[in-house]
């Protein structure tokens, strides 16, 4: 009985597609709602989240792959080993690791960076490329900041040990700085425009 209903469903699907009905391609998630996904983020450390159990769309009705599908396929084909991206993507890691596994791909290592924060009205908010001109690199060139100064300031935001290194290595080129993901802020550095000036 189960077999005949599946065959009937497949025939209905085939007829609908052949009839021109729009369709999407979804992942049939092998996830278990009672199991956890464990991974080691290169900045945030060990993270535990529920496994993905959602049958997510991989190809949209226009034939364009979703970010999730493109991430797994493109990074596999390009032999990407490490992915650095904003921490708003942490919630997607269980799905992404699941996609790598079901596709038979070696998973990448993730480093999720916290957004740069800005003080506003007594609180903090994420620096926004839509609302804040200082979020664009071109802004600093337009207002006359030397590139070297901007690079130095950005390194103070990215690595907590940069200022100590600079004091000890006043004449060293920035390329000598031993950048370390473990020294990045897990909660988001505060952008201080006054300090830059």
Predicted regions and their residues:
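Active-site beta-loop-alpha junctions of metal-dependent nucleic acid enzymes
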Residues: 86-92
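Non-catalytic beta-strand/loop surface segments
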Residues: 13-19, 23-26, 32-69, 95, ...
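Catalytic adenosine-cofactor/nucleotide-binding cores of aminoacyl-tRNA synthetases and other
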Residues: 102-197
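Residue-level structural signal for beta-strand termini and adjacent loop
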Residues: 71, 83-85, 130-133
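Short acidic (Asp/Glu) patches
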Residues: 9-10, 50-53, 134-135, 196
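A short, conserved beta-strand element enriched in hydrophobic/aromatic residues
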Residues: 67, 78-86
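Single conserved hydrophobic/aromatic residue that forms the stacking wall/gate
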Residues: 1-8, 12-15
């Amino acid at each position: 009985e189960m077999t005949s209903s599946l065959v009937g469903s497949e025939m209905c699907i085939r007829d609908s597609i052949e009839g021109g009905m729009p369709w999407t391609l979804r992942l049939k998630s092998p996830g278990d709602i009672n199991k956890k996904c464990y991974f080691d983020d290169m900045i945030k450390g060990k993270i535990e989240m529920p496994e993905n159990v959602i049958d997510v769309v991989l190809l949209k009705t226009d034939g364009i792959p979703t970010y999730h599908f493109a991430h797994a396929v493109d990074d596999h084909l390009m032999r990407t080993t490490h992915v650095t991206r904003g921490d708003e993507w942490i919630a997607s890691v269980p799905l992404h690791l699941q996609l790598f596994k079901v596709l038979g791909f070696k998973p990448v290592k993730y480093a999720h960076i916290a957004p740069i924060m800005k003080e506003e009205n007594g609180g903090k908010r994420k620096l926004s490329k839509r609302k804040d001109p200082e979020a664009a690199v071109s802004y600093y060139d337009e207002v006359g900041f030397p590139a070297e100064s901007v690079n130095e300031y950005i390194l103070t935001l990215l690595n907590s040990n940069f200022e100590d290194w600079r004091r000890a290595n006043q004449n060293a080129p920035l390329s000598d700085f031993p950048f370390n993901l473990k020294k990045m802020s897990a909660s988001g550095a505060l952008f201080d425009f006054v300090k830059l000036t």
